[in-house]
Amino acid sequence: MKRNTPFSKSCLALIILFGILPAFGSAAGVQANQQTAPALKEIQVPVIHVKGSHYEAGYQIGTQLKKNFLQEVGEMKEDPNWKKIRAEAELYLAYSRKYLPEYVAEAQGTADAVGLGLEDLFPTLCEELWDENYRFTKGCSDLIASNDVTADGSVLAAHNNDTSPSTQELVTIIHYQVDGEPEIVTVGYGGLGISVGYNSAGISLTGNQVDSTDMRVGVPRLLLVRKILAARTIGQAIDAAILKERASDYNQVITDRNGEIYSIEGSATDYAPLYSTEGYLVHTNHYLAPWMRKFEFDPQGITSSIVRYNRGVRLLKNNRGRITVDLLKQFLSDHVNYPGSICRHGNYVKTTFSVIINLTTGTMLLARGNPCEVKYNEYKLISRKEN
């Protein structure tokens, strides 16, 4: 079985969990390491608005992003193993119909709008089947700060998303107003796969790709992401992240506007619910919980993740009580261990978008590209906050 697939979500979720991690003894007020750069560029990101039933929302996504879907499926069909991948994806589809039928309805709506069969479109949601060199394979960094450690009492979720440079032009915001769900704002790469998001109930999802040894046939992890973002409580979000019938999992970083922060380190058959006891959390692309380390697919290939994680912990720990949106922008632009830094650079993989979600105000800052080079634009898409 191949590994990783389109819209995959490996990310540096710099998760800081004291009680699991050793303390870092460094002077307070550690500053981000930034290289001198020219004036920041202004880059706009397209916003897609969808509403109605799940099928209708999917149909609207397909209508507005038809070109992207046709290109993505066309590229998949060029794979010499396409027939095998398509057949295996039908097994994942059967699980999804049984356990998350509402999101299969969304995918069906998209397929109908684009003029594809669902069996041809659904493999774009089954990253478990794809090679690790696929361009949407990711590495990411998360730095989360609760109201206990920010300067103004805001709850802030910061995230860098690292993929192939060729995906940067595809970065798209989708604003969902789906019947029976909270309003949801997501960022992804112009398809059904979601990298990060938040909702009107005050739940955000960021996180990181972790590659485990126990992938299996089941509900694709990209559908877990969609279900998490429909949650109205952090408990519901965690339940969605650990669906028993999952094919694999990410490290799901789930935060609520009360300042509760969990990192759900998952594989197909196990998970570790890591909780932030110090008011902040960092995670990247490797397992932290001792009992999850046996699932690490490539223990020799996580050096960048280890460095990014420890760097993120140090930056947040030593700035407790002073953390602001502007300071997080600096942290997300950090170049320690360049090019494999929090702000990642390179021809194979780079930071293709950077986001800071303010769960207190219900707003999002997004920069398409490296945050050391591109301005953040603010988006206020949530029309109402739920209690």
Which residues make up each language-model segment?
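Bacterial N-terminal signal peptides that target proteins for export
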Residues: 2-13
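Intrinsically disordered, low-complexity segments
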Residues: 6-8, 24, 51
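C-terminus-biased signal that marks the final domain/tail of proteins
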Residues: 28-139, 229-387
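Flexible glycine/proline-enriched surface loops and loop-helix/loop-strand junctions
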Residues: 88-89, 217-224, 293
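Internal mixed beta-strand/loop scaffold within catalytic domains of large alpha/beta enzymes
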Residues: 127-222, 239, 352-356, 364-366, ...
